[in-house]
Structures are given as structure tokens and as C-alpha cells.
């Protein structure tokens, strides 16, 4: 493993930001630290960078324990959420800043900066100031400045949070391509699930200072190891009594059920006959257009489920009584998530 955290603990007063955190990252991987606010993901990033010190445990980078190594000597590039560019420096000087601090040769600085300017797609804008750039361009300059000293590890704290939605989507793709091209080991913090899915090779789910799960986006989404991951990852509905749905086995000690939109099919009343015995009656509470599909909120008893309906199908309307078919559910048992299948249905409707 290129980066390893072993039994890391960090407390701020009564708040435990890191609770016996351990994980490893292979060289060249792009890792997403994903979790809700206050889950400890930024603390992990800052401890790896050397901006915070763990109370106990070891941080290992490329085989070396770096707990006592100053941040400036860890070979790390750090991209901050708010860019942290120098307002009165040009694009060129912002990117060159770290190299000048290292007292690098002027010729090398110029070659390195111009190479990075071309890499980030801002050739010709070297003399502009941050105020003359768009949010997306400023973030690219921040990336280049972090990369200028040729770090072996790149850390990014909510790198797209301050950018509008359209530019954010473009930058995600750009960042992934850039990191693949450079082959640099990278870790980014995000609370955006779509961002983590699209950009990361692997995701680490954080919750209350602990690591809930680590794996590829598909592994974590399809096979959540804990009740928290099952409920956090993806759009979900939580049901107190899953026996309201037909044809699901009972889980001894089962508590609540978690249902994702892709586990649910909503049809007009009596439209689907093949699995009629699995139908539960519901009432459409909301219909929202989502481009390629309609997003539905359907009340079944005391529960509101999220579902999707294709634009190719006859639309349902708010207030309409419909048939609801639930094909899969996660049942929580302590902090375990148990996947159950509707025993009367086939896999035809499951789309992930």
C-alpha cells in the first residue's frame, strides 16, 4: 500500500473526529472520502497532509511513518475548497509560488509552469489575475499550483464545492482524466455521492469518525456492508414495517427496511398482471420531471417511497391510485444490512 492509516484516533474536546481509523490506498489510485458533514473525512485528509496531528496511530506514506514529518516535507500537494489563490499574483506566479519557495532554477520554473498551464487548458492566460478568471479556471490554477512541486500524493478538500453545477460536471471529468494521465495517487473529500461515483476508483464511507466501508463505487452501492452505508448511499426510503410488502422473508431481529428507487416499479392500476400478487396499493403524492424519466413520490400506508417511471410509459398523475411493486429491500439488523428479494418476482425490473 502506498498510503496507510493504522489505528488513527483524533479528538477535539468531547468530539471524536477519528475513531480507530485504518485503511490502505494503492499507488496511482484516485480515492473519494465520502460522508455527511461532521463524519471526519476532512480531518483524515488534514492529518495525512500534516496540517493536523493524530492523538494516536500511524500515518505511512510510501513505506515511511510520517507522523513527525513536517507538512512541507511529506511530498504532498493540497487543493483547498476555496482555491486559496493569491489575488495579487498572476496565473503564472500562483503556479510558480511553491517552486520559488523551494528556490528552484528559474529556467526549470518557467518550463514547469508552462507545461502545467498547457495541461490545465489555460495557455495564453498566464498573465491574468484570479479576479479575471471563472470559478472553473481558478480551480484549475489551484490544481496546477498543487502539482507544480511534483508531489507524490495529491489531496483535494471538496474541490468542486464552490463551482456552479454545469462547470462542476465538466471539471469532474477533467480531473479524472488528468490524474489518470499523471498517475499520481490522489484522495479527495466530498459529500456528493454522484461526484464520488463518477470520479473515484474507490470510495471510503465515513460516519461519526469511523470507516463504514471501502470499495469500488459499484461494490459499495450494490453490496453495502452496514446499515449506515445502505441508507446513506443513493436515494433511499426507510420503512418501519417492511411486511407491508408481499413476498419478503422475515429476518429474525430485523428492524427497518431501506428501499431504493430502482427497487420499485409503479404502474397504473391493474396495468401489470404477471406479478399482481406482489402489488401493494399506493397513491402518487408528487411527480417531478427529471429529463429522461419522471421521479415519483408514492405513499404506501405510512411510508413514502421514491420511484422512477419512463417517459415512454403512460404518465401517472398526483393523487392517482397506483400499483406498487417492490423487488428488493435492505433490512437492517443492528448495523448490518441484509438484502432480501421478492420471492414472487424475477430480476427483470432491477436497474442499477
What spans do the regions from the language model cover?
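ABC ATPase nucleotide-binding domains
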Residues: 30, 71-81, 85-225
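The feature captures the beta-strand-to-loop junction immediately N-terminal to the Walker
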Residues: 34-36
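ABC ATPase nucleotide-binding domain helices that frame the ATP-binding cleft
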Residues: 42-45, 141
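Helix-to-loop junction immediately C-terminal to a conserved catalytic motif
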Residues: 49
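Conserved ABC transporter NBD signature motif
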Residues: 57-65
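Non-catalytic connector elements of ABC transporters
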Residues: 236, 247-352
